[in-house]
């Protein structure tokens, strides 16, 4: 499983180098095949291909008569791109996805268990501040009794 946040740089060709600690797991799990797609929070989601397939299958079964379902399909399936990690552990971020997430030179790769989020570094810092402000209020019911 993937965890931790790592600051990375996009190279001149729009690629990131996957941190060494994740490369072997990705090669073993999916032969370096990753699915990148847009997220509603303004970042990108990066899935090992086997983790993406059940999500794709569920999304594809949603009713095309429901406007929210169509919007979700357009966001996630419409932006999805299969990319393969090269021998140096680099992954191309397609221009359309770089534009969507406003990715510039400095990015953050954030492990989220079965996937990664890829953020523009400035957006990551801003959302971290928002997340910390949420913690000042009441916890949602599902987190009551949760302890670290």
Language-model regions, residue ranges each:
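A positional/architectural concept
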Residues: 2-44
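Exposed loop/turn and edge beta-strand positions of beta-sandwich/beta-sheet ligand-binding modules
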Residues: 4, 12, 79, 87, ...
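Short, structured motif recognition centered on aromatic/hydrophobic residues
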Residues: 14-18, 47, 89-93, 97, ...
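Short, charged/polar, Gly/Pro-enriched secondary-structure boundary elements
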Residues: 25, 54-55, 124-128
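A short beta-strand-loop micro-motif that forms or neighbors metal/cofactor-
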Residues: 28-43, 80, 102-119, 123, ...
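Helix-adjacent hinge/juxtasegments
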Residues: 45-83
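Beta-rich strand-turn-strand
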Residues: 81-90, 95-104
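Acidic/histidine-enriched, glycine/proline-rich intrinsically disordered or flexible terminal extensions
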Residues: 131-148
